[in-house]
Curated annotation (Swiss-Prot):
<keyword id="KW-0503">Monooxygenase</keyword>
<dbReference type="GO" id="GO:0016712">
    <property type="term" value="F:oxidoreductase activity, acting on paired donors, with incorporation or reduction of molecular oxygen, reduced flavin or flavoprotein as one donor, and incorporation of one atom of oxygen"/>
</dbReference>
<comment type="similarity">
    <text>Belongs to the cytochrome P450 family.</text>
</comment>
<keyword id="KW-0479">Metal-binding</keyword>
<keyword id="KW-0408">Iron</keyword>
<dbReference type="InterPro" id="IPR001128">
    <property type="entry name" value="Cyt_P450"/>
</dbReference>
<keyword id="KW-0472">Membrane</keyword>
<dbReference type="InterPro" id="IPR036396">
    <property type="entry name" value="Cyt_P450_sf"/>
</dbReference>
<dbReference type="GO" id="GO:0005789">
    <property type="term" value="C:endoplasmic reticulum membrane"/>
</dbReference>
<dbReference type="InterPro" id="IPR017972">
    <property type="entry name" value="Cyt_P450_CS"/>
</dbReference>
<feature type="binding site" description="axial binding residue">
    <location>
        <position position="449"/>
    </location>
    <ligand>
        <name>heme</name>
    </ligand>
</feature>
<keyword id="KW-0349">Heme</keyword>
<comment type="function">
    <text>Involved in the metabolism of insect hormones and in the breakdown of synthetic insecticides.</text>
</comment>
<dbReference type="Pfam" id="PF00067">
    <property type="entry name" value="p450"/>
</dbReference>
<dbReference type="GO" id="GO:0005506">
    <property type="term" value="F:iron ion binding"/>
</dbReference>
<keyword id="KW-0256">Endoplasmic reticulum</keyword>
<dbReference type="GO" id="GO:0020037">
    <property type="term" value="F:heme binding"/>
</dbReference>
């Protein structure tokens, strides 16, 4: 046998072995007697992920197909087996009752080579517990009240800019405007920096924030490899954040930290808290103080959480209200009733937190558009888990499980006519009739959204201010139906959000 023939033979053997391994791996759930859909040779059950479909849509489709017939179907993320939790009682166990066995999210991060991914949302085990305990004090109601004045000041600038833009055109891109509002809020609260992106069309914080969420570093195939083989990917030094995003935020945070430490500046904001953790070696139990990279990661995720989730939530709310003037008028009436008690819209924090219909509108928005949780929650088993009362279902240690938030939120048994935008679903009477795990706008259990209070404050104020001063209707450039960006980590619009805007109050001088 000559060398060429031997090489072809060897390649054939390797290809056969690879195909055998792939087929054996795809028999993972069948060998356990757990139903699943037939997987694609390369992409498993997530064919079209990030190119055509958002992960939330794929998991929601599983919910619709298997609900009522199976409590825990299997799914393949590329070649990685995972499961989708459909049963409500099992959902409670995963998120709350048996949380100790599902404390990790199972998401890829690489602290060594991609340090900004080592943040509270991603990290696991004792490190997560310690960070959660130490970071929680910055999100108390008292801290929110301290940060509130900053949000209020930026809110006034938001109104000024919108009035100015209306002198040029009545059709405004509210997605862009609200993203700039939130960038300026978070820039001040997290970095102590006046971004002024509302007036600066080329603000770098805004551009890098968008890129970190909407522009993946790798294509879908490479991301499927990372998801399937996370430990190998870490050993290979694989990163997920774009390089320019990494460099921008690391340098921005370092400059701010150096300036504060050199000049002994304190603002009692989020950055001050993580600086205290960095400089106090006893502050995090078994782990010691925060390193600079760990500090930077927490500031980075705080920026992303406040920037994208709040702006998209407000944008989606305006999109729905623009199509339903009756709901918009009712919200405006309740907002005005409270705001009229304060001079020049300087509403207090406590008053803002007590506008019930505003809360209902935002909760219904997060039902239809679960921005913060990315339309699906993930958890990972820390040990083998036998499903109570159903021993057929055993999740081996390390199994990733999905909570299909989008599927739950659009379940007609829970929310009749789920495509309809109806804030009455969140009246006190209706909320009492549902279980907490039937609405997961901020997650549930010990690993819910730590920044929930801040996100609510930011979204409530921004939405209340613009509804008080402007009327919103759809225009020829409004994207109906709304299209979602399949590449985005969060549940965000694919296109701009143009609405017709009409001023209905005099400009505050």
């Amino acid at each position: 046998m000559d060398f060429g023939s031997f090489l072809l033979y060897a390649l054939g053997v390797l290809a056969s072995l690879a195909l055998y391994f792939v087929r054996w791996n795809f028999g993972y759930w069948k060998r356990r007697g757990i139903p699943h859909e037939e997987p694609h040779l390369v992409m498993g059950n997530v064919k079209g992920l990030r190119s055509k479909y958002h992960i939330g849509e794929i998991i929601a489709d599983y919910y619709r197909k298997f609900k009522g017939s199976d409590p825990l179907p299997g799914i393949f993320l590329g070649h990685k087996p995972a499961a989708v939790v459909l049963d409500k009682e099992l959902r409670k166990r995963v998120l709350i009752k048996d949380f100790s066995n599902f404390a990790n999210r199972g998401l890829y991060y690489n602290e060594k080579d991609d340090p900004l991914t080592g943040h509270l949302v991603m990290v696991e085990g004792e490190k997560w517990r310690s960070l959660r305990t130490k970071l929680s004090p910055t999100f108390t109601a008292g801290k929110m009240k301290y940060m509130y004045n900053t949000v209020l000041e930026v809110g006034q600038r938001l109104l000024e800019v919108m009035y100015e833009k209306l002198e040029v055109s009545s059709e405004l891109d509210m997605r862009d405007i609200l993203a700039r509002f939130n960038t300026d809020v978070i820039g001040s609260v997290a970095f102590g920096i006046e971004c002024n992106s509302l007036r600066n069309p080329h603000d770098r914080f805004l551009a890098m924030g968008r890129k970190s969420i909407e522009v993946p570093r790798h294509n879908a195939l490479i991301m499927a490899f990372i998801d399937s083989f996370p430990e190998l990917s870490r050993k290979l030094g694989m990163r997920v954040l774009p390089e320019d995003v990494h460099q921008f935020f690391m340098s921005s945070i370092k400059e701010t930290v150096d300036y504060r430490e050199k000049n002994n500046i304190r603002r009692n904001d989020f950055l001050d808290l993580v600086l205290d953790l960095k400089n106090n070696p006893e502050s995090i139990s078994k782990l010691g103080g925060l390193t600079f990279n760990e500090l930077a990661a927490q500031v980075f995720v705080f920026f992303l959480g406040g920037f994208e989730t709040s702006s998209s939530t407000m944008g989606f709310a305006l999109y729905e209200l623009a199509q339903n003037q009756q709901l918009q008028d009712r919200l405006r009436e309740e907002v005005n009733e409270v705001f009229d008690q304060f001079k020049e819209d300087n509403i207090s924090y406590d008053a803002l937190m007590n506008i019930p219909y505003l809360d209902q509108v935002l909760n219904e928005t997060l039902r239809k558009y679960p921005v913060g949780v990315g339309s699906a929650l993930t958890r990972q088993t820390l040990n083998d888990y036998v499903v109570p009362h159903n021993p057929k279902y055993v999740l081996p240690k390390g199994t990733l499980v999905f909570i299909p938030v989008l599927g739950i939120h659009y379940d007609p048994e829970l929310y009749p006519n789920p495509e309809e935008f109806d804030p009455e679903r969140f009246s006190p009477e209706m909320v009492k009739q549902r279980d907490s795990v039937d609405w997961l706008g901020f997650g549930d259990g010990p690993r819910n959204c730590i920044g929930m209070r801040f996100g609510k404050m930011q979204s409530r104020l921004g939405l209340a201010l613009v509804i008080r001063h402007f009327r919103f209707t759809v225009c020829s450039r409004t994207d109906i139906p709304m299209q979602i960006n399949p590449e985005s980590l969060a549940w965000t619009p694919k296109n701009n959000l143009y609405l017709n805007v009409q001023a209905i109050r005099k400009k505050i001088k």
